[in-house]
Amino acid sequence: MDVLGVGWDHFTAHELEEYDGVNLLKGGIVHADAINAVSQKYADEICTSEYGWGLERLIGEKRYKLHGILNGIDYDEWSPAEDIYIAQRYDTDSLEGKELCKNDLQREVGLPERNDVPLIGFVGRLVEQKGIEMIAHAIWRLMSWDIQIVMLGTGEKWAEHYFSDIAAKYPDKFRCIIGYRNDLAHKIEAGSDLFLMPSLFEPCGLNQIYSLRYGTLPVVRATGGLDDTIENYHNDGRNGTGFKFYDATSDALLGRSEEHTSELQSRGLI
């Protein structure tokens, strides 16, 4: 407390004390004039025991000053009409360039150049929070479908090795690039038909917003900012900006994936 320059009278269960230690976040929540979470759904979630990490009761008491404000993106960098990394620039009035971007992505990562199959992109950390175990359980069934998947990311070593091994077994269907390249991240957003984000929790998320910008349909688990930013597609074909699933299971991911790939093909979008 002396190091912080804070009096010991603040070391109480109602302010900074937490299990005989100092919890600065707790103190911030107590004394802040306003609290911001990066989406309204996540603001609601952190008031529950599942997402509150022991502070849910305190956050609930301070709910009156908690606000959910979505993150924004850099619309100058993430714009298919201005993107310096993609093979062909395009916009909502002329989507022909997206097909050229798909072919360019396929060449870049070594996939066969095919416009008749759905191409699914993933860019993110290969960690539990991002739903990587769901993808790991689903990948074998996905490899039995006529699809292509491009994964870019780094994270837990088991995941890096696991997906690299699968890519070696299915070179015409799955490519896994370990690491991060900004140019390739742009190419994946522009060249993919679908973008996968099966997060266990996601305070806001940015890639689903990039995907909307690039005309790439997000496939997301309905949590946090993913739920707030994506309107679920309905079979009437008139509403929706992407596809949501709710259970944190590979079966739920696969069910929604099969539905949306079939929908893309039936509507002649690939």
Question: What residues fall within each predicted segment?
Answer:
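Catalytic cores of nucleotide-sugar-dependent glycosyltransferases that transfer UDP/GDP/TDP-activated
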Residues: M1-S262, S266-R267
